[in-house]
Structure formats: C-alpha cells, structure tokens
Design a protein with these regions (language model features):
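Alpha-to-beta junction loops
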Residues: 48-49, 84-85, 102-110, 155-157, ...
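Short helix-initiation/N-cap motifs at beta->coil->alpha
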Residues: 36, 72, 87-98, 145, ...
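Acidic, polar ligand-binding/catalytic clefts
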Residues: 76, 80, 85-150, 218-220, ...
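Extended ligand-binding regions for polar small-molecule ligands
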Residues: 27-36, 73-81, 139-142, 149, ...
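Short, low-complexity disordered leader/linker segments with a strong preference
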Residues: 1-44
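Periplasmic-binding protein-like
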Residues: 130-137, 204, 208-250, 269-277
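Bilobed "Venus flytrap"/periplasmic-binding protein-like clamshell domains
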Residues: 49-57, 67-80, 134-187, 204-206, ...
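Extracytoplasmic small-molecule ligand-binding "clamshell" domains
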Residues: 29-111, 120
C-alpha cells in the first residue's frame, strides 16, 4: 500500500513537471513569435515598408514626383494609425512576392488580387477592395469586336502587365490569343495606343480612363468587367499577429466610412487627374 502511494506520488510529480515544462515552453514560444512578428518589427523600427508597383489610379506620381493613388492612401493611413512612418518600395510586379519573402519590405499593398496560387506563398488580409478585369481596344485593329470570343484568336495580340491577375484572366478567357507581357502596365497601354496590340486587359476602371482620354483611338469593347476578385494586404506566412491587426484595421476604416470615401474619389471621379497632368 505504501509502495503504491509512493509510486502514485512520483507519477503525479513527473506529470506536473511535464505540464509546467510545456507551459513554460509555450509561453517562451509565444513570446518569441510576438517578438519576431512584422508588427513588432515595424513598431520598433518606426517605419512601415510597403512593396508596390505603379498603375493608374492605384499608385502613380503627381506633377512633383510624389506618389499618389488609392493604394498610397491606404498604406499611408495604415502607417499613421500604427504611429509610424511609411516607406514605399517600388518593385516590378513579377518579382514582388519573392521580394516580400526575402524581406525587402514588410507588406504588399498594391492592388494584389487574392488568388489561390498566391495564397500558397503568402497570407492575405480580409479584402479591403474588390476589382474586376476590363478591356480597352484599338479602334482600328479591333473594329467590330464586342465579345471575348472576338479576341480569342491567334492573330489577336493582347497586352498585359507581367505577373498580374490581368495576365491570368486573359490566358483563361482568351487562350488562343497572343499574349504580350510588360513589366510596367503603362507600357501595355502604350502598345495598344501605338497599334501594336489589339487590346489591353487591366483592372477596372483603368481601361475606361484610357478610353475617355483617347476617344479617337481607343474604345471599350465590353460593357462590364469579365472577372471579379478580392484585393488584400499580403504578408509573409506564419505572421498571425500582423494579419490579425490588419484585419481589424480594415474593419475599422470600413466602418468609419474612410475606405468608401477613398474608393469614390479614386475610382468614381476624375478629380485627381489635375494632380498628374
């Protein structure tokens, strides 16, 4: 009886050691993860480094060379609410995810569509915007075209930005067309303006802006967008503290009306055009 009691006490003591050890390890791991999170690094550094690429009206330069646009406003407001400065890191779109993964910047805020293929490499916040793909075409070369099927031929050239969801949408919707890809979206639009491509696929409302700007050379062949995709903030995988903060922040700026006001200004008006001309 005495031997059994001693054995039982030893088992309880051993179990207690295991439990306390697990708790200590868990606390230590949680502390380590918090210290290593992007959120903590940004707060400690005092600067939020944002990876982005220029495309109108999400991110572009004004007359003085300063970056402006919807994504610029989003990143600037986010940094302000965090109590830090913002630093923009212009990056070619095709290499923007690898640059995030290697630590060139903290987050991607650049109109990035939340795609399953991208989700394998990075984590995304909840959507802060939704966009769809649209087209603008050359009046001479695409005369009479008003359906996706009209562009789905090998002799039709579609211009897109390299590595973009526009490229993915074009390949899926017009698999037979010849795709011509560019590092900068403005180059894709210039290709159509120069008559070297039939059309360009891009996120709405940019194609409509170009059609309005060059009514003698361009037109909108489709009445509506032909895709719809959510836009989120991209962060490195495993960084759940940062992701949770971004999700809470997005809900906050949606609730106070700021996000909708910025969308209206950049996507539903053309008041900003005087700042870039």
């Amino acid at each position: 009886m005495k031997k059994s009691l001693v054995t039982g006490m030893l088992l309880l003591f051993t179990l207690a050691l295991w439990t306390s050890g697990d708790l200590a390890l868990g606390t230590q791991l949680q502390k380590q993860l918090t210290q290593e999170s992007t959120l903590e690094k940004v707060l400690k550094r005092g600067t939020l480094r944002v990876g982005m690429s220029t495309f109108v009206p999400w991110a572009m330069k004004d007359k003085t060379g300063k970056l402006i646009g919807f994504e610029i406003d989003v990143a600037t407001r986010l940094a302000q609410d965090m109590g830090v400065e913002v630093e923009f890191v212009p990056t070619k779109w095709a290499g923007i995810i690898p640059a995030l993964l290697t630590g060139k910047f903290d987050v991607i805020i650049g109109g990035m569509g939340v795609l399953p293929k991208r989700h394998l490499k990075v984590n995304f916040s909840i959507p802060y915007d939704y966009t769809g793909m649209s087209m603008v075409a050359n009046q001479q070369h695409a005369k009479g075209f008003n359906r996706l099927e009209d562009f789905n031929h090998r002799d039709v050239v579609i211009a897109v930005r390299l590595g973009s969801t526009a490229a993915t949408a074009a390949k899926k919707s017009m698999p037979n067309a010849t795709l011509r890809q560019f590092d900068d979206e403005s180059q894709a639009y210039q290709e159509v303006l120069n008559g070297k491509a039939h059309a360009v696929v891009g996120s709405a409302p940019t194609p409509a802006f170009y059609a309005l700007k060059y009514p003698d050379r361009l037109f909108l062949p489709l009445k509506e967008t032909f895709t719809k995709e959510p836009i989120g903030i991209a962060v490195r995988k495993g960084d759940f503290d940062t992701l949770t903060f971004f999700n809470s922040w997005i809900r906050f700026v949606e609730a106070d009306g700021w996000l909708q006001e910025r969308k209206h200004y950049w996507f539903e008006t053309r008041d900003w055009e005087t700042r870039v001309k």
